[in-house]
């Protein structure tokens, strides 16, 4: 926006001034609409960043390296969730590996999380689930993730957040924030969801909204969430998708006054992602992440 504003003030405005001085009204009037549109695009269309009260970059991951994900920023959730929550609580079909470049790596400036059709530890698929827990934990702020997600029936990619210390109890009492979820049988659709004790998927009261977004598996999009003490806002490419307000009734509805951390994963199958089965012909499938930025 800085370059665009300099273009307006130093180049475009003087040219327009001279044009209006030399032109009659018949020439000027048909030009007004086009000029207004140009001004809107260049100068009057604020980004999420310019609207936000959070301006200070406090954490970022640009993936400007090669190999395994940076261990100072990322840990792995491992296996199939057993013995605590086998299938990760959703009857998912993948085995999450760690320190294995076939499933999680950085290359060409992107994080790659790859789901593969292969047997491991009694499961028929492998993938990865990365988390910033105890390496990046935040209360309030704006998080933005530029990503391109996989396609195919049975895929279940997610960009989401969980509480770091579970101070209000186990799921869903301490909350869950889903910045972006997609299931492969709903191509070109993404959802943003909040789970709490009062509002959650187990009792079908979760606060969720979606948007039809063509090209989610062929182009990068920016998935964002802004979190204050009073409200959460969810965006795709700067356009609001969902919001959730603190109704001040207590932690059953709003447990979001504690630190949360970020998770990135590609699940396979499960209660929701596998509702219509898994198409084995689509493997391997990848989620690519270009960058992640957290402002407070």
Regions inferred by a protein language model and the residue ranges of each:
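Bacterial Sec-dependent N-terminal signal peptides
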Residues: 1-52
């Amino acid at each position: 926006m800085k370059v665009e504003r300099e273009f307006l003030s130093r180049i475009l405005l003087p040219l327009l001034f001279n044009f209006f001085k030399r032109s009659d009204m018949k020439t000027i009037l048909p030009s007004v609409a086009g000029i207004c549109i140009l001004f809107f695009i260049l100068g009057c269309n604020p980004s999420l960043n310019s609207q936000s009260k959070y301006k200070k970059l406090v954490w970022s991951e640009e993936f400007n390296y090669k190999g395994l994900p940076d261990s100072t920023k990322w840990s792995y959730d491992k296996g199939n969730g057993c013995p605590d929550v086998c299938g990760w609580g959703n009857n998912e079909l993948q085995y999450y590996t760690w320190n294995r470049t076939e499933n999680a790596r950085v290359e060409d400036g992107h994080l790659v999380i790859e789901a593969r059709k292969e047997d491991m530890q009694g499961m028929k698929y492998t993938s990865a689930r990365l988390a910033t827990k105890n390496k990046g934990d935040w209360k309030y702020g704006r998080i933005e993730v530029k990503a391109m997600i996989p396609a195919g029936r049975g895929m279940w990619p997610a960009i989401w957040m969980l509480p770091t210390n579970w101070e209000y109890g186990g799921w869903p009492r301490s909350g869950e924030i889903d910045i972006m979820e997609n299931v492969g049988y709903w191509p070109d659709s993404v959802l943003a969801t909040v789970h709490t004790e009062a509002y959650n998927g187990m009792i079908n009261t979760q606060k969720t909204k979606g948007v039809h977004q063509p090209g989610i598996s062929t182009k990068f999009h920016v998935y964002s969430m802004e979190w204050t003490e009073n409200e959460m806002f969810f965006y795709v490419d700067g356009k609001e998708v969902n919001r959730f307000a603190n109704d001040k009734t207590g932690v059953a509805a709003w447990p979001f006054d504690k630190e949360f951390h970020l998770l990135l994963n590609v699940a396979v199958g499960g209660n929701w992602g596998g509702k219509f089965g898994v198409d084995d012909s689509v493997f391997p499938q990848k989620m690519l992440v270009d960058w992640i930025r957290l402002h407070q």
